[in-house]
């Protein structure tokens, strides 16, 4: 079994959006977190069928403040 880091955001329409940094193009969306987690697992399995994960290690997400 392999583990992947998943980034989860909520868009302006209220959908949860998940993406996998180490699998290019691997993302999905859903109205609930439960559905999102099921869908991202399916998306990861499909992505692994056509592409190997990048060797980049996911470190984390950091907030950065700028004057805008």
Question: Model-derived features: where do they sit?
Answer:
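Short, charged, surface-exposed hinge/linker loops at domain edges
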Residues: 1-5, 11-13, 38-68
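Short aromatic-glycine-(Arg/Gly/Cys) micro-motifs in beta-strand/loop hairpins
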Residues: 10-20
